[in-house]
Amino acid sequence: MANLISFHDVAKHKCKNDCWILIHGKVYDISTFMDEHPGGDNVLLAVTGKDASIDFEDVNHSKDAKELMKKYCIGDVDQSTVPVTQQYIPPWEKESTAAETTKEESGKKLLIYLIPLLILGVAFALRFYNNK
């Protein structure tokens, strides 16, 4: 059985000489890798104390990088200790959501102008037919 590590314990290790990160439920002790990371140690330090899965996927790491990660894995995070965060939404879904919102807003704007015009039209029609 894999070593279960609480999120609180992972969050404690957040300095260059003692750095753990959480990616896809796995805990990695990357203290010895800090100087080797192509993006620099600041990039890694920026994702300590949180689930770094989204940040990791955004970079689109190579297969070699993902293979190298196995060397630094020290266990699995206890999922019951991980704070709830926002769910990852791929960029293409974000655009779709924004487009739907824009369509809804434009429909509402159209109604704002059409309803008064419709009321005005009915009022003129009633007045015209009542005068005859």
Swiss-Prot record:
Gene3D superfamilies the record matches: Cytochrome b5-like heme/steroid binding domain
Transmembrane segments: 110-129
GO MF entry, a single one: metal ion binding
Annotated membrane topology: Single-pass membrane protein
Single GO cellular component term: cytosol
Coiled coil stretches, renumbered: none
Domain of life from the UniProt record: Eukaryota
Positions bound to heme: H37, H61
Pfam families linked: Cyt-b5
Places the protein is found: Endoplasmic reticulum membrane
Domain Cytochrome b5 heme-binding: 2-78
SMART domains for this protein: Cyt-b5 (SM01117)
InterPro entries (alphabetical): Cyt_B5-like_heme/steroid-bd, Cyt_B5-like_heme/steroid_sf, Cyt_B5_heme-BS, Cytochrome_b5
Keyword list, A-Z: Electron transport, Endoplasmic reticulum, Heme, Iron, Membrane, Metal-binding, Transmembrane, Transmembrane helix, Transport
Subunit composition and interactions: Interacts with CER1, BI-1, FAH1 and FAH2.
Family of the protein in this entry: Belongs to the cytochrome b5 family.
Known role: Membrane bound hemoprotein which function as an electron carrier for several membrane bound oxygenases, including fatty acid desaturases.
Protein name from the UniProt record: Cytochrome B5 isoform C
Species in which this protein is naturally found: Arabidopsis thaliana
